[in-house]
Amino acid sequence: MILKENKKMFVLPEFGRIQFEGFQRFIHQDLVEELTNFPKIEDIDQEVEFRLFGERYRLTEPCIKERDAVYQSFTYSSDLYVPAQLMRRRNGRIQRQTVHFGSIPLMNSQGTFVINGIARVVINQILRSPGIYYDSELDHNGNSIYTGTIISDWGGRFKSEIDGKKRIWVRLSKNRKVSIIILLLAMGLNMNDILKNVRYPNIFLRLFQRQAENIQSYEDAIVELYKNLYSAGGNLVFSDSICKELQTKFFQQKFELGQFGRRNLNKKLNLDVPGNEHLLLPQDLLAAVDYLIGVNYGIGTLDDIDDLKNRRVRSVADLLREQLGLALDRLEILIRQTIHTVARRKRLVTPKGLITSAPLTTIFQDFFGSHSLSQFLDQTNPLAELTHKRRLSSLGPGGLTRRTASFQVRDINPSHYGRICPIETSEGMNAGLIASLAIHAKVNDRGSLLSPFYKISKTLGEEHIVYLSSEEDEYYRIATGNTLSLDREIREERATPARYRQEFLTIAWKQIHFRSIFPFQYFSIGTSLIPFLEHNDANRALMGSNMQRQAVPLSQPEKCIVGTGLESQIALDSGSVVVSNQDGQIAYLDGETISILLQNEKTVDIKSIIYERSNNNTCIHQRPVVSQGERLRKGQLLADGTATVGGELALGRNILVAYMPWEGYNFEDAVLISERLIYEDIYTSFHIERYEINIYTTSQGPEKITKEIPHLDSYVLRHLDNNGLVVPGSWVETGDVLVGKLTPQEAENSLRVPEGKLLQAISGIQLANTRESCLKVPIGGRGRVIDVRWIYDEDTLPNIANMVHVYILQKRKIQVGDKVAGRHGNKGIVSKILPRQDMPYLQDGTPVDMILSPLGVPSRMNVGQIFECLLGLAGDILKKHYRITPFDERYEREASRKLVFSELHEASQEAAIPWLFEPDHPGKSRLIDGRTGDIFEQPVTIGKAYMMKLIHQVDDKIHARSSGPYALVTQQPLRGRSRGGGQRVGEMEVWALEGFGVSYILQEMLTIKSDHIPARSKLLGSIVTGKSIPKPNTVPESFRLLVRELRSLAVNSDHNLIFEKDLRKKVKDV
């Protein structure tokens, strides 16, 4: 973006840099510090000393390439080697060796980690920064209670409070509190020290007289603290055992402020404690309580705990450093145990004999495999991938939980301005807890979020960029982004909207310190792709941001006519496109390889990705866009990737839409489409499914991959080669065998079946002692086999495979039940596919591609879609592409509407289509019914909208069951498609069936089809023999379960048969 005033080019940041910067900090800084802090280890007699030289560590080059790690299902990692020294003081002998510490997974060029062939990403956690925070709460009487909470970096928290009687307590748990005076005296301070170092000595003196008058010494304070903590009565006397118990259970509890906590505490309480003192000291507690008294009297400020200055981001560096620290702690314990054992047995040992690679390797494996912040990378499309790397989570260890997080924590805070996107977040339970970084935000070494601003120099008249944290920018007056459009002279005359101390106000330009740099500065990359964003309700913009990440890459992608200008940057930073790193010339080109002849006569080969499966089963494929012999410049596009065209992100297609009702088929967000979208492959996508089968060694011997499978029809084995694997290129249907496998079993088991006994009795034939356990194509898995891979375990012997992967490609056209959406939160399900001749058509005979409901616009307040489709129509006719920045009303009122109408008018004039822009109803046109040829009564809004097909496809959701598993307890069918579940008729379904009076269907659903075991078993026989289905004469299993549950509560239930005449007699007697 070029700014006229200062003639400077402003460059967008690299969107994936938060991941790269974090990992580089871990490798170059945190790893060295943790290894350097590893302590010297000595035996009991101090004769043997072990130490590490962490600053001279070495990471080896990975033994496998990034792409091969994915292909062979390996982990992309590097081995860590550290020099170690073992010294024996008795004879002065020193042994130095470089020891193997284990393997550390490496970040690849995409900013992700490849673990067992699967791309994973470590997302950033945002949580409360350690330090002290002052707040006020209401007690049960409605009175304000002032509290000060010290949050640790590692450990618990201290909460001090002043109650209604002006007494000061330290709360240790929800129900336990202790007087601050008793605690300070027990921590070793005396009354003189306390009174000298506080601003309010009189208050402390009164407290001492009211709460601790009987305490004359340190010993009395220890006894009193013990009574308060453990509710001990009687006349306790000070003893070493009481003191020792308090030391171990209370004072030595891990409470570490850390580097950031110490800095925050010193700053807030004006202390001069050294920065390397990370533990909580008595003077910290004293100063904290002294400040709390001041807050109670109106001196000092309360903290907004949700302000970003009180929160910090734990990046991948902090999370990996924490895991490394745990591994080194575990290793230290193992080394100590080994040294003590060796010293006791008088054995010799080397540094390599002391260190094992297990702790580091296993801890990193557990972290990447099961930690809540190490996630399966969302690879639906390039935008989803990039957004996942820029995600901020308040959940995870040390963070919030989705059930206890309040509305206040989830809400937007003024400090988020330019740092965290106010639009993009999850829907549902995680709303407000999962956020996304704003476009220009970055994280510094202290974990603070920074946003860039132009600093306005009053003297020089120049501007330069400054990054400010939330703590810094509240002291400055910052003009908002709408001032970008104004000339300097006009700006200085007008009052300017600005932000100061988290409030919005209007002030003169000469009072401004900083100004925003970019209209998109406040939003995430997903939200920044929505054109005319300012005309949409925030809830719909949120849905639009989220649904773009669910768009399936199409086989024939198309760039949007109306965009925002960020599409090329997102495509580049996601890593889906290939660009040239140097000047040169294309020497050779085919579908898989691009060879570039450099200026120094060397040749560089670049391998393209061909039909690779993503984590979300979408297809990753790169297409060359250069020709042989073409000259290249550095940075030039070589190949388009998934969902990109010409180096720009292309998630959907520009199609002709009309906003009108059509026979009720687009009721409630349903969508009507033309069959042209199917026949011309407009919304056709490729999906690659991976099926795997393990090869085990059983107690009876190893399993065998073979084509010779007894008891199976040769038809289902027709695609297998001689080795028992399916041939790549085969078209397979449901039930076909992909991998033939035989599992050995005990001979006795096969002879127990009646056929086995009969064969053995007649002719002495021994039945085969194997059973088939083949990999077969599941229901809905039909497609083309594109690859078959043997997978070898990294830790086992070479050439012994333990798994086979089969990849099947499916070509899916759009169909009824698929979900489609625009970029403005306008989503819908395809309800009917009409022939082209039945679709409404324009006055020039062009049939409409999609009919949307007009009632979906006014109530949702996402008018941006109307602007987009009208401007798209003008762009389609004029052969133009538009890139619109948001908030264009800063130029003039109704700027968006004027732009759209002026472009429509120009298109109407140029193409000589008068009905394209009619002044009586601009943006609307008369449509003709394709079935009757009649003109519809009202003019209809038509346009070219950019619509996407989403990953929620009917093929993945539709499910039917004829037979399947039952739950053990209730004996009812399991729930869910993945478990092969069936129908479960609940109360409301029963009411619906009762309303129609279908008693037999209802009776079958509640008994035979569900949980009536005897009736279920008799049903098959009656169907086979053609007899009538027997009526159940016992109760279903769910009733038995109810009876058992009542019995477990000591309530017995019984039933007796009462004849009608007996019942009449009893009623008569009553």
Curated annotation (Swiss-Prot):
Q: What class of enzyme is it?
A: transferase
Annotated Pfam families: RNA_pol_Rpb2_1, RNA_pol_Rpb2_2, RNA_pol_Rpb2_3, RNA_pol_Rpb2_6, RNA_pol_Rpb2_7
Gene Ontology biological process terms from the UniProt entry: DNA-templated transcription
Question: Which molecular function terms from Gene Ontology are attached?
Answer: DNA binding; DNA-directed RNA polymerase activity; ribonucleoside binding
Protein keywords? Chloroplast, DNA-directed RNA polymerase, Nucleotidyltransferase, Plastid, Transcription, Transferase
Report one GO cellular component.
Answer: mitochondrion
**Where is this protein found?**
Plastid, Chloroplast
Query: EC number(s) for this protein?
Result: 2.7.7.6
The reaction(s) catalysed by this protein are: RNA(n) + a ribonucleoside 5'-triphosphate = RNA(n+1) + diphosphate
Query: Which protein family is it in?
Result: Belongs to the RNA polymerase beta chain family.
Q: How does it assemble?
A: In plastids the minimal PEP RNA polymerase catalytic core is composed of four subunits: alpha, beta, beta', and beta''. When a (nuclear-encoded) sigma factor is associated with the core the holoenzyme is formed, which can initiate transcription.
The record's NCBIfam families line, in alphabetical order, gives: PRK00405.1
Function according to Swiss-Prot or TrEMBL: DNA-dependent RNA polymerase catalyzes the transcription of DNA into RNA using the four ribonucleoside triphosphates as substrates.
What protein name is recorded for this chain? DNA-directed RNA polymerase subunit beta
What organism is the protein native to? Angiopteris evecta (Mule's foot fern)
| Taxonomic placement | Eukaryota, Viridiplantae, Streptophyta, Embryophyta, Tracheophyta
Gene name of the record:
rpoB
